[in-house]
Amino acid sequence: LELPNRPTAVFCGNDRTALGCYGALSDLGLRVPDDVAVVGFDNFIDISGGTWPPLTTVQLPHYDMGRWAVEYILSGHAASGEPVQHLATCPLIIRESA
């Protein structure tokens, strides 16, 4: 980020990492989103709802993911190691960081 041709956006693997990114950008004197846009991934509301500016993030279906995990275990697939796939809808939650 200290290079003259720095990135204009950072996509973080989760909202906690995005919070750390906010701090690193601030330490460098950069502003979100004026200098660098930041996007998180999971919509962990304790983080994404409490940042300034509010964090743009991708919503993970946490409840559904938990239900799928329980169904996988109870179905016996987990014991056999048989993989199961689920297609999840993960909407972009647009706030002010990007």
Where are these regions (language model features)?
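Flexible loop/turn connectors
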Residues: 2-98
